[in-house]
Regions:
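A short, conserved structural fragment
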Residues: 58-69
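Short amphipathic alpha-helical interaction segments
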Residues: 44-59
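Short, cationic-aromatic polyanion-contact patches
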Residues: 7-19, 68-95
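Short acidic, hydrophobic short linear motifs in intrinsically disordered regions
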Residues: 28-42
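Small side chains
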Residues: 14, 33-36, 54, 76
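Short helix-capping/hinge SLiMs at alpha-helix to coil transitions
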Residues: 23-31, 53
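Long, low-complexity, charged/polar intrinsically disordered regions in eukaryotic proteins
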Residues: 1-9, 91-109
Length: 109
């Protein structure tokens, strides 16, 4: 039973993390990304937990890892073509909810 609540909390943090990456990608451009320390500050998770979460999102194809000036950063990938910088925030948030809803967090909680 407690595993359910842990997965629910993890899903909420993954939602916040992915939402920030998607908004950044749409509004800041293709080179926008955050490193692990920035993601720790965003979600409130420790470094070990954030790396596990990011690798789960990488495995599902929502996030990619790239190197920017010798720093490993992460950015959102495969946003639908109907999302751009003129899209209302509610449409972007709905996409993020659907995308995170398809991710299985069972082994992480």
């Amino acid at each position: 039973m407690f595993g359910f609540f842990k997965r629910k909390a993890l899903k909420k943090r993954a939602f916040n993390l992915y939402k920030e990456l998607v908004f950044g990608r749409l509004y800041e451009g293709n080179r926008f990304g955050l490193n692990a320390e920035d993601l720790c500050k965003t979600t409130g998770l420790n470094l070990f937990s954030i790396l596990n979460l990011i690798h789960r999102l990488i495995a599902t194809g929502l996030v990619e890892e790239y190197e920017l000036v010798d720093v490993v950063c992460y950015r959102a990938v495969k946003e639908p073509i109907y999302l751009d910088d003129t899209s209302p925030p509610s449409i972007i948030t709905d996409y993020v909810k659907r995308a995170i809803g398809r991710v299985d967090f069972k082994g992480l909680a």
